[in-house]
């Protein structure tokens, strides 16, 4: 999947995460979280795992975490990535 435009998913509410995805030459992940020292590596690993499953190798991803669970982070990364591409989405494979 190729990222062709800027897209955002999520909110800045407590227990949520806002993920911003935009075109970039390589894969760049920025994590802003009050619990980054404790969970930063896990957050980055989850983001990388979701991007790899979607076949994304070049994008800038900015994660504004407000204490979201891992399943919420996965859903937000998927949603932002799908909004940021012009490719057709195979919804049966996603769901």
UniProtKB/Swiss-Prot annotation:
O-(phosphoribosyl dephospho-coenzyme A)serine occurs at: 14
The parts of the chain that form a coiled coil are none
Q: Tell me the InterPro entries matching this sequence.
A: CitD, Mal_deCO2ase/Cit_lyase_ACP
Subcellular location as annotated = Cytoplasm
Record keyword Phosphoprotein present: yes
Pfam families named among the record's database cross-references: ACP
Keywords attached to this entry: Cytoplasm, Phosphoprotein
Q: What is its main location?
A: cytoplasm
GO terms under cellular component: cytoplasm
Give the protein's biological function.
Answer: Covalent carrier of the coenzyme of citrate lyase.
Q: How does it assemble?
A: Oligomer with a subunit composition of (alpha,beta,gamma)6.
Could you tell me what this protein is called? Citrate lyase acyl carrier protein
Per the UniProt record, the source organism is Haemophilus influenzae (strain ATCC 51907 / DSM 11121 / KW20 / Rd)
Q: What are the leading ranks of the lineage?
A: Bacteria, Pseudomonadati, Pseudomonadota, Gammaproteobacteria, Pasteurellales
């Amino acid at each position: 999947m190729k990222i062709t435009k800027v897209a955002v998913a999520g909110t800045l509410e407590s227990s949520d995460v806002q993920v911003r995805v935009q075109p970039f030459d390589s894969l760049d992940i920025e994590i802003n979280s009050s619990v980054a020292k404790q969970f930063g590596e896990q957050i980055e690993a989850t983001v990388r795992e979701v991007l790899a499953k979607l076949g994304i190798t070049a994008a800038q991803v900015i994660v504004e975490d407000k204490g979201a669970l891992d399943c919420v982070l996965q859903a937000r990364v998927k949603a932002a990535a799908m909004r940021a591409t012009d490719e057709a989405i195979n919804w049966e494979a996603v769901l």
